[in-house]
Amino acid sequence: MLYKGDTLYVDWLEDGIAELVFDAPGSVNKLDTATVASLGHALDVLEKQSDLKGLLLRSEKAAFIVGADITEFLSLFQVPEEQLSQWLHFANSVFNRLEDLPVPTISAVNGYALGGGCECVLATDYRLATPDLRIGLPETKLGIMPGFGGSVRMPRMLGADSALEIIAAGKDVGADQALKIGLIDGIVKAEKLRDGAISILRQAINGDLDWKAKRQRKLEPLKLSKIEATMSFTIAKGMVMQTAGKHYPAPITAVKTIEAAARLGREEALKLENQSFVPLAHTNEARALVGIFLNDQFVKGKAKQLTKNVEMPKQAAVLGAGIMGGGIAYQSAWKGVPVIMKDINDKSLTLGMTEAAKLLNKQLERGKIDGLKLSGVISTIHPTLEYSGFDRVDVVVEAVVENPKIKKAVLAETEDKVRPDTVLASNTSTIPIGELASVLKRPENFCGMHFFNPVHRMPLVEVIRGEKTSDETIAKVVAWASKMGKTPIVVNDCPGFFVNRVLFPYFAGFSQLLRDGADFRKVDKVMEKQFGWPMGPAYLLDVVGIDTAHHAQAVMAAGFPQRMQKDYRDAIDALFDANRFGQKNGLGFWRYKEDSKGKPKKEDDTAVESLLADVSQPTRDFSDEEIIARMMIPMVNEVVRCLEEGIIASPAEADMALVYGLGFPPFHGGAFRWLDTLGSAKYLDMAQQYQQLGPLYEVPDGLRNKARHNEPYYPPVEPARPVGALKTA
């Protein structure tokens, strides 16, 4: 053994070939600060070996290196710019030393090589991979850019266009694509990976492969003519601004950095990478996006913990077909849980099966499945008008019309047709679970399971615990939702649960703005372009359905009369009374026509002006800041109330529910992250300017208490001390 660290070791193989093996104590290898330091120590030893002829890098895990340790990021981002720059310089000196070894080097890459893992293998001369490879640089998705030389080496290896596509989009690619673009040099079966890598090293040692020429390309300026450079970088910048926009600075910064470094050698190019990385790491966007990643891990970890002793449902059922029922049935069958889809009429069953078939055909068109797989999946969805087979069902979700009487009747009838241990769930969006459970003999076996539309796209499932719901019931439904590829978040029962409870105060803020003379088009534009929502409130209401929102608004008002009962007729009432239900009938705040792809396209409709004039004061202009404040304060206040009342368990779960269920702008990180970024004291000052607008604008007591000391909701992060720990390595 030449060297043994906590996360890697170096040993001799044969004929002057050494292997450096990543083998961290946990289940995966991460390129954390300790591993970078250990790699430096390993290189100290290797550089002294006069008999060294070649070096093989490999992993003892199922994945090579999954990336940097993102749990370290928030503390690293607290480090002053100069110190962070020094640490990056140190880390890059380690990878440069690996790249500059006087012998050929190869990485034997299995599974994932992402982020820092990808940057590590870019520093070797050759890369041999297994068919299950996923390799790429996802940093821009976290609000940063590659910092270990990825933005320097990859363009010089692949050419500007292929590298920009991966780096700017934060993409990873599979083995075949990686081979095609030159990111790896070959693909072999896992059992032949080590021997194959040694064989390539021997060829390089013997002079059959020119490893020095291969290495030299990474040390020199990018080989592009001025015209080629202008074309590549102009197109890349245009594409990035179109897709990422102004709220995500990392992708455009990465492109501009690669462009500026194109004429430079490795050392100068790495300095530019460092100079670009450090300011990005100190942005609110990076903190928010890293926060989302960590919150996602927290939420998924919680679901895993909940379900560790639960048997996965083997057979499911959906009550109520149609678009929603068909979407749920498709998702369950697609992920391997057969499903019975029951309805009371053939038309709905046909609609449900058509929806499932349409979604499967899209997978076929994208090349994700073949015809055999399609027919196999569709055959596991059993449409029926009867309860036959319900005695074999482990879990049932009811997805009938949002009417408590109908839901109660369907649930009570179904309870008599299933086994005593079968779990029942309701896909209600607003009706309290306790109310629906009142007709059941086994309320402990019942909970809410709120999917979001369209089911196949929206990652969130709210799992709602009723007063009598058992832990086992929650665990079974969480297990099924997880199996379906969804992110389940458990919330406690109340009208609207969590997501709709906080959405309708947001809509109420919108209604008040319109009542006071705001133009709905401007409100939408500000909330989309300035705050960053994927849809403004008017457009969102049209998509949800004005009739659906009108009904839900009444349910919420009955549930929370003090805050959500209004004493005026609003825009939603006016459109509902005029039978303008949104996209579903082509008329809402906008008029909708199908485009060439059959998708609804919004157009201005002057007829809506007279309807809104009846419920609004004369039009007046509002500043962007006032629109954002009046829209967001009611939502944020309600989010905080949900935490204080125990409806949602943590800021992390609240923020993920908002991002995954409503499309809360990820670069803000969720309501609590936005609140922390703003500062609780500053938020209180802002909210107090609008408290005359009513109870929705009154800040909850818990938030007022935090504001006195400007306390955050997320625990404060201490700056890391990586430089002092590593610079002598």
Swiss-Prot record:
PANTHER family: TRIFUNCTIONAL ENZYME SUBUNIT ALPHA, TRIFUNCTIONAL ENZYME SUBUNIT ALPHA, MITOCHONDRIAL. Residues 708-729 are annotated as: Disordered. Pathway: Lipid metabolism; fatty acid beta-oxidation. Residues 1-189 are annotated as: Enoyl-CoA hydratase/isomerase. The keyword Lyase applies. In the N-terminal section; belongs to the enoyl-CoA hydratase/isomerase family. PROSITE patterns: 3HCDH, ENOYL_COA_HYDRATASE. NAD(+) binds at residues 324, 343, 400-402, 407, 429, 453. The record marks 119, 139 as: Important for catalytic activity. The active site is at 450 (for 3-hydroxyacyl-coa dehydrogenase activity). Keywords: Fatty acid metabolism, Isomerase, Lipid degradation, Lipid metabolism, Lyase, Multifunctional enzyme, NAD, Oxidoreductase. GO terms for biological process: fatty acid beta-oxidation. It comes from the Bacteria. Its EC number is 4.2.1.17, 5.1.2.3, 5.3.3.8, 1.1.1.35. GO terms for cellular component: fatty acid beta-oxidation multienzyme complex. Substrate binds at residues 296, 500, 660. This is Fatty acid oxidation complex subunit alpha. Involved in the aerobic and anaerobic degradation of long-chain fatty acids via beta-oxidation cycle. Catalyzes the formation of 3-oxoacyl-CoA from enoyl-CoA via L-3-hydroxyacyl-CoA. It can also use D-3-hydroxyacyl-CoA and cis-3-enoyl-CoA as substrate. One of its GO terms (molecular function) is 3-hydroxybutyryl-CoA epimerase activity. It catalyses: a (3S)-3-hydroxyacyl-CoA + NAD(+) = a 3-oxoacyl-CoA + NADH + H(+); a (3S)-3-hydroxyacyl-CoA = a (2E)-enoyl-CoA + H2O; a 4-saturated-(3S)-3-hydroxyacyl-CoA = a (3E)-enoyl-CoA + H2O; (3S)-3-hydroxybutanoyl-CoA = (3R)-3-hydroxybutanoyl-CoA.
